């Protein structure tokens, strides 16, 4: 089973690569909202590939989501 820490590490790496790609081709960087959606899409893909469970998706908060409590 894969942990949230491992998934977050991979997502951070992917976002760094994407940031460098965008800088090199001269397009705007991802917004904070883009990163929220990226996390959701990435974890959904892991679930579809049966790498993580629905329970993990339900328990894991999105580290890129803003919360004003």
How would you describe each model-predicted region?
Residues 1-69:
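Acidic, Ser/Pro/Thr-rich low-complexity regulatory regions
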């Amino acid at each position: 089973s894969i942990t949230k820490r491992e998934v977050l590490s991979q997502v951070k790496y992917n976002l760094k690569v994407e940031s460098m790609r965008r800088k090199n081709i001269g397009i705007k960087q991802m917004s904070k909202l883009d990163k929220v959606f990226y996390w959701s899409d990435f974890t959904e893909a892991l679930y579809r590939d049966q790498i993580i469970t629905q329970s993990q998706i339900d328990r894991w908060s999105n580290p890129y989501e803003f919360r004003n409590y």
